[in-house]
Design a protein with these regions (language model features):
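Domain-level signal for soluble alpha/beta catalytic cores
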Residues: 1-927
Length: 927
């Protein structure tokens, strides 16, 4: 019987559809979910679909069977949330592996019943993303914090995959990925468990993007996501959830053009309507899916939320006899990534005469920057982050980070700094180079990066065994690597030794380990020249010769170097040092040097160096004549003397140093400056701008209600249009919090010591729903806008919400829900609040919620204000209107008027639909 890899080349494979949608059709009770075994477990079990593998295996097997009858080639095991971290919400952590095993075992039994030599059926062990993220902080005041670590997720998913493999999975499907670091940990766990069991199962990856701009929730573009996964042995890449077929199609088309894997798509049954239901039918979806098939952009097609066996039957018929997508070739260029893709090809360069060159920013290195070391020692992280930000602004395409100092905890500082810059989109967009001589520091850093970063470095210094072990780690964590030309004998200083070590390392990495040569960056050792020792004079020449040899003889490999080492003899003379670097890079880049650890801002233009100086510097760098180094030392002394004299004259004359020109946005009125600062997350000028605003506005709170809220509303609009993504919104929220903290003493003074919070808000994900990422984002944004947040977490019963709201005397309640059953629970919560005599505002949000549902179902059962909030960035502004005594009545009246109009329009539309259905029933049959 053929395996799935062989079949994927010949035909389009049919994946099954939604599991949750089908389970709902059985109208299972709490007792069905619990069974006898879990009768006494605290909390609500209904909604924990994975436990049905144990308590109602008949239901799960029946669903598998119906999908197989519909023509599915691949059955997705009911194991989406079989991780300890997910089952903790139900107090069933210790059953997670058993659920995974049973889910796969039941699927195996049904697949084996339907398998034939002509149509074998396969079990996909399903690994969901969990409701935690490794890449983002749950605490706005501490961007370095993480709710879960790579190691914790790796451990949980390892246990899950262990159960899936033992249960009979043929494939591991890691799906609905919104954070690439989560995905990396899951791939790592899957590969580790396969090795344990002695099997090699295909790994299917399916991401979900958060908006039509095409970024994941954690901020990566689709291309950056592909780069992050490029070192791993992936079978297929695709997308699921979030969108219906038309919205998903452009992304699948792009994947089909650039991803060197089989392509999968399992879209929802359209987009949820206002009532949280899916309007698409199997018949209406069939032609949409047929486009994916007929255009040859997929190898695997199936369904997600809202789909059923009827949908899959239509898809199977559409795919019959159709040719699958032809997988594109692997990229010929190196892929690196932060939030964005960095493709190291002919377009990556700064100087016009370079073929390709990547500036690696050198200033975030405690060994190379005294200022950076001081800031890290003083825990002045905001200033240290500013150094990274400036390097990127100055042209660094990669940021090198090194924390190796005897007085620092290098591992802790590396993790802390990498986590902090991950929250800075203008830095996080570029890849990171993790630089350390301590391997445990490098490993810790690798577990912080969702992008594809660079390890700096490994070498043969400790022999082949250690070298290969380190290289395996690099591959395991999905990175590229710098290989130093250093072996057991020592550092290579001659051309011959450089190429000997480079070739040996290349063969070990490529031939023995199977590393992609594009992920190898050799550092042939940039060493100091013009030191006064004749044997050093040829170091630059031999580096350049070795670079050319590597470029010609080691296909795919790159060359880098720490450029500032070259001019070490001239420390203290910046001009000469930068001129030496410029000349060296000019010649090294011509023959294949494509990376360099440099100060990007200090790059000189080769063509603007005075001709006499250029000739002398080239004599030294290229070792063209004896005595050139002495002449350069003399020139350096002359230049330094002139510079010192100019400084002394300026000081004697009292002439102040010229100030840099202010950026254009600083010339705008204070309101516009504050809005811009919020949008871009700039805190540098908040104090003077707020001081100016306080002179203009009668009360400090007016600054919040005016320009600051205007800025937040603008961010909300941009986010809604897909022009900003989540990490940017979170950074905006932190900037808002900083602004409010500046205003707080003024508000206190005006209130004579009264409360300075904008209001107390209770937040909860309703009973039956364990999704809390959206709610957590709302909590972050609201707290940054000076609201006191009480977060009850997930799976919160209506009675608990009411009790806490009364106890805490909250000003408003926020209800969150991601799944369709949550809509009914929100109605019940509103009824319970009504019964308890509460009339405080209710804010409703989440993927399945809508304004129409609020108007039809929630507002009519509650006398207080109820509003649907489209996204997290809008909550603060809405709350401000509700809690403003002057604004609130007008706002509520507008809402009630709008709800009445929506209800009338809905009922009119339903009447038309009913009339049409009646007419169809009463049609005259003439034939």
């Amino acid at each position: 019987m053929k395996n799935i890899r062989e079949i994927a080349k010949e035909k389009i494979l049919i994946l099954d559809g939604a599991m949750g949608t089908e389970i709902q059709k059985y109208n299972l009770t709490e007792d069905d979910f619990r069974g006898e075994r879990f009768r006494d477990v605290p909390g609500m079990m209904k909604g924990n679909n994975d436990m049905l593998n144990i308590t109602r295996p008949d239901v799960i097997s029946d669903i598998y069977r119906r999908y197989l009858e519909a023509g599915a080639d691949i059955i997705t095991a009911n194991t989406f949330s079989c991780q300890r971290i997910s089952q903790a919400d139900y107090h069933l952590e210790d059953c997670a592996r058993e659920m995974a095993f049973e889910g796969a075992r039941l699927a195996r039994i049904e697949c084996d019943k339907f398998s034939t030599p002509d149509k074998p059926r396969f079990v996909a062990g399903d690994v969901g993303p969990t409701n935690k993220t490794c890449s983002m902080s749950p605490d706005v005041s501490n961007p370095a914090a993480r709710e879960i670590t790579y190691d914790e997720l790796f451990t949980d998913v390892s246990e899950q995959v262990d159960g899936l493999i033992e249960g009979g999975a043929d494939v591991i499907l890691i799906e609905t990925i919104f954070d690439t670091l989560n995905c990396k940990a899951m791939i790592d766990a899957a590969i580790t468990m396969m090795k344990k069991h002695g099997v090699e199962l295909p790994i299917m990856i399916s991401l979900t993007v958060s908006d039509l701009a095409g970024r994941t929730l954690s901020g990566q573009t689709v291309d950056a996501f592909l780069a992050s996964l490029s070192p791993y042995p992936i079978f297929s890449v695709g997308m699921n959830c979030a969108f219906g077929a038309p919205q998903m199609k452009p992304f699948i088309e792009h994947l089909a053009k650039v991803a060197p894997y089989y392509i999968s798509a399992h879209p929802n049954a359209g987009l949820p309507n206002e009532m949280g239901q899916y309007d698409e039918t199997a018949e209406s979806m069939a032609p949409q899916i047929a486009e994916f098939i007929d255009e040859g952009i997929v190898n695997i097609i199936g369904g997600c939320c809202g789909t059923s066996p009827e949908f899959i039957a239509h898809y199977a018929r559409s795919a019959e006899g159709k040719k699958p997508h032809q997988v594109v070739e692997k990229p010929k260029y190196m892929w690196l990534s932060g939030l964005d893709l960095l493709q190291v090809d002919d377009s990556v360069h700064l100087p016009v005469d370079a073929s390709r060159f990547v500036n690696v920013g050198e200033r975030c290195n405690v060994a190379g920057s005294r200022k950076f070391l001081r800031l890290i020692n003083e825990k002045s992280y905001e200033e240290a982050i500013g150094i990274a930000r400036k390097q990127v602004a100055d042209g660094a395409a990669v940021v090198d980070v090194n924390m190796d100092d005897g007085l620092l905890d290098a591992k802790a500082e590396m993790v802390n700094f990498l986590n902090m810059i991950a929250a800075e989109p203008e830095i996080a967009k570029v890849p990171v180079m993790i630089d350390s001589s301590k391997w445990e520091v490098i490993l810790a850093g690798l577990k912080c990066c969702q992008g594809k970063c660079i390890v700096n470095s490994i070498s043969l210094k400790e022999g082949e065994e250690v070298f290969l072990s380190h290289a395996r780690d690099v591959m395991r964590y999905g990175a590229a690597v710098v290989v130093m030309c250093f072996d057991e004998v020592g550092q290579a200083t001659t051309y011959e030794r450089r190429i000997e070590i480079a070739e040996r390392a290349y063969r070990l990495l490529v031939d023995k380990l199977g590393m992609n040569p594009l992920d190898i960056i050799f550092d042939p050792n940039v060493l100091a020249i013009a030191t006064g020792m004749e044997e050093h004079d040829n170091y630059a020449v031999e580096f350049i010769r070795a670079t050319e040899w590597i470029h010609r003889n080691l296909p795919g490999a790159h060359v880098s170097g720490g450029v500032s080492n070259l001019s070490f003899s001239f420390r203290g003379n910046t001009y000469i040092r930068e001129a030496i670097h410029c000349v060296f890079l000019h010649h090294a880049q011509k023959v294949g040097m494509d990376f360099g650890i440099v100060n990007a801002k200090a790059r000189m233009d080769y063509n603007k160096i005075p001709k006499d100086q250029l000739e002398l510097i080239e004599d030294v760098v290229l070792n063209r004549r004896k005595g050139a180094a002495d002449d350069l030392i003399e020139l350096a002394a002359e230049i330094k003397a002139k510079a010192d004299a100019a400084k002394a004259a300026a000081k004697a004359g009292g002439a102040p140093a010229p100030k840099p020109a202010a950026p254009e946005w600083r010339k705008q009125p204070v309101e516009e400056r504050l809005k811009y600062a919020l949008q871009k997350g700039i805190t540098e000028f908040l104090q003077p701008d707020i001081d100016e605003a306080l002179q203009k506005y009668p009360h400090a709170v007016n600054v919040i209600e005016g320009p600051l809220m205007d800025g937040m509303n603008l961010v909300g609009e941009l986010f809604g249009r897909g022009e900003m993504f989540l990490p940017q919104v979170v950074k905006t929220a932190r900037t808002m919090k900083a602004a409010v903290s500046i205003l707080q003493p003024h508000i206190e003074a005006e209130k004579q010591g009264g409360s300075t919070t904008a209001g107390k808000i209770l937040m909860a994900t309703v009973k039956g729903d364990v999704h809390d990422i959206g709610k957590n984002i709302v909590c972050v944004v609201m707290s940054c806008n000076n609201y006191d947040i009480i977060d009850l977490g997930v799976m919160v019963p209506a009675e608990q919400i009411v009790k806490k709201a009364i106890e805490e005397k909250v000003d408003a309640v926020g209800l969150s829900g991601l799944i369709t059953p949550s809509l009914e629970e929100m109605v019940r919560t509103a009824k319970e609040m009504q019964k308890a005599g509460l009339r405080i505002p209710i804010m409703v949000g989440g993927a399945t919620t809508s304004e129409l549902h609020v108007a039809l179902k929630i507002a009519p059962v509650y006398d207080g204000p109820v509003i649907w909030v489209k996204d997290a960035s809008l909550n603060a502004g809405i709350c401000a209107r509700f809690l403003n005594e002057t604004e609130c009545p007008k706002f509520v009246a507008e809402l009630n008027e709008r709800y009445e109009r929506l209800r009338n329009e809905y009922h009119e539309q339903q009447a038309k639909i009913a009339s049409l259905e009646e007419a169809r029933k009463n049609k005259l049959d003439l034939f």
